[in-house]
Amino acid sequence: MKSLIPFLLTLFLASSFWLEGKVEDTKRPSVLLINVDDWNDWNSVLKGHSQAITPNIERFAKKGVTFSNAICASPSCVPSRPALFTGIAPSRSGNISNDSGKRPWRFYAGPVTITIPKLFSQNGWASIGIAKNFHRGDVPEFDTYIPPFKTPKKLKKVGLNLNSSAIWDIADMPVSEMGDYKAASAAIKTIDSHEGPLLLSVGIYRPHVPWIVPQAYFDMYPPETLKLSERRVKDLDDLPERLKLVAGLEAKFGKGYHEKLVRKGYDKQFVRAYLASVTFADEQVGRIL
């Protein structure tokens, strides 16, 4: 089940790596944290899919430490992100599903819990958040917060899910208009201009659905050569009952969703769109690095 669980890709870099030419505070090195949304092990490092094109993650992995057995605290955004930033497990906080998002994450974490950005701020770092970090409620935690950039809705409307809403599509626009591209650009500008110890936390939204990226990323994965992962029969049977419920509610496995995709011939299109989004995300990570 590891390959089905999205994770937050966390990249830490000391200031000596990415603040070249600037005076370092050796006691307080700058830290870069990149959160990539819903990216499983489909990359050229963990090799969850043999055709994933992710040269930037691969380049970074060769310079650092790869935690190949790391799993996020929860397979849903609302509980997973606060768990990362507070160190409090969902099983302890009670923030266990996306339905928990009806209340702010602080309700579950408690009023006195100190988050990672607050801890840095209290100890001499400037903390800057860009785009999606906490899944709502970012503003009070960072000294400076830049909200997610919206992508203009210029779509070719070619990929619909079974409810006729866009779950994948081709963005009919330059890559520079994509929200994640703008977030990466804001991160680059911050790195280039900031002086002194810095915690910079950047959120990259793709490959979260909808898988909408420009045509060039789809072209990297020709449908006729695309491989589908082997489907494991009764793959959910060994899960605890609670996780079976999560799978049914969140991933729609309990509703025969995958069977419908296969029957309608959409499975390869979905794999292609996800991989295209993965490569797009990898490119934004590479620009920041």
Question: What are these model-derived regions, one by one?
Answer:
Residues 26-29, 38-51, 149-182, 189-289:
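Active-site-proximal cap/lid insertion segments
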Residues 27-31, 63-68, 123-127, 195-200:
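Loop/turn elements at helix/coil->beta-strand transitions in domains of secreted/extracellular proteins
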Residues 6-16:
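Bacterial N-terminal signal peptides
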Residues 45-81, 87-88, 92, 124-128, ...:
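Short, structured active-site-proximal loop/turn typified by the sulfatase FGly-forming signature C/S-X-P-X-R
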Residues 83-176, 215:
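Catalytic-site neighborhoods of secreted/periplasmic enzymes
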Residues 21-23:
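Boundary at the C-terminal end of the N-terminal hydrophobic targeting segment
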Residues 1-4:
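Positively charged n-region of N-terminal signal peptides that target proteins for export
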